[in-house]
């Protein structure tokens, strides 16, 4: 699962895969894998806390879809994080970047995350629909 966090200016947060990980240097939306028996929202709260040191208070699922890698197919749940607190920082060695929504298609984002860009661009989020720093 992954989450879209927005700042007060309406920019969305993306993270860069650190050296040593598959697809290092590429950008993605922050998130991770569910633990066995964990529901998607609980996993989102845990992952964003572990990766970014933020506390997710609420969110809405944006979409659920599958992506085929050469070795396996994965299911992805994407959430709009509507209320969160803390100052995001890369606790796992990843760089962070706030990006204007219209600029997302020009970023070197993982192919698996491209459907998220399309979904975000189709929304009328406006400013102030999410709460965070």
Give residue ranges: language-model regions.
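Short coil/turn segments
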Residues: 17-20, 54, 109
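C-terminal structural segments of small proteins and small subunits
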Residues: 86, 101-115
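Charged phosphate-binding loop/patch that engages nucleotide di/tri-phosphates or the phosphate backbone
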Residues: 112-133
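A conserved beta-turn-beta hairpin within the catalytic core of GNAT-like acetyltransferases
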Residues: 22-25, 98
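Conserved N-terminal beta-strand and adjoining loop/helix that marks the start
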Residues: 1-12, 33
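Active-site-adjacent beta-strand/loop module that shapes the phosphate/pyrophosphate-binding cleft
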Residues: 7, 55-56, 64-89, 95-97, ...
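The catalytic Nudix box helix
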Residues: 29-61, 100
């Amino acid at each position: 699962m992954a989450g879209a966090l927005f700042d007060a200016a309406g920019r969305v947060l993306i993270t860069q895969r650190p050296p040593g990980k598959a697809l290092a240097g590429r950008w993605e939306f922050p998130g991770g894998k569910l633990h066995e028996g964990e529901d998607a929202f609980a996993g989102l709260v845990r992952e964003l806390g572990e990766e970014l040191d933020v506390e997710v208070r609420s969110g809405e699922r944006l979409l659920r879809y599958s992506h085929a890698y050469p070795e396996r197919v994965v299911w992805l749940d994407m959430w709009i994080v509507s209320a969160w607190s803390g100052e995001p920082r890369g606790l796992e060695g990843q760089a962070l970047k706030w990006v204007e929504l219209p600029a997302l298609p020009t970023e070197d984002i993982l192919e698996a995350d491209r459907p998220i860009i399309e979904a975000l661009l189709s929304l009328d989020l406006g400013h102030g629909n999410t709460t965070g720093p």
